[in-house]
Amino acid sequence: MARQKIPYALEIKVLQVAVAILALVPIGAGLAGAVFGIGVFGPAASLGHDADSTGRYLSGLLFAIGLAFWSTVPSIEAQGVRFRLLTLLVFTGGIARLTGVFLVGLASPVMLFGLAMELFITPCLAFWRERLDRLCNGAL
């Protein structure tokens, strides 16, 4: 099977670089939210301690998701199950965020960028990884 990967080695490397760079988004946002609280995402002074605690917890999850994506990078072609699960988690969060758009209106541009990452970019990376898996290994 290693011989089959050779024609796609460059494309695998490009995917690895893309995932490594794009995983900086949840890692950075998660770290900022955990350290500085939800105020880092906008005015939050009147939200109270419970909202801050929830925001820090969710930021920790976001940070961990980014680290988990990083863990797929070295052998991304063999990380199908993990990559699909992480994509499902991110996409589900995006659906929840999109629900908020319909219920309370558009969020800030930063949050809309997050929405694009969750509903478009991350699934595209997953489909790309699956395509490479099929091409390299003939399996899903």
Description of each model-found segment:
Residues E11-D52:
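Membrane-helix boundary elements
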Residues A45-D52, L106-M117:
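Non-cytosolic membrane-interface motifs at loop->transmembrane helix junctions
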Residues M1-E11:
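Short, Lys/Arg-rich, polar N-terminal cytosolic tail immediately upstream
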Residues Y8, L67-V81:
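Juxtamembrane helix-break-helix junctions at the cytosolic face
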Residues L24, G28-A32, A51-V73, L88-T92:
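Core segments of alpha-helical transmembrane spans in multipass integral membrane proteins
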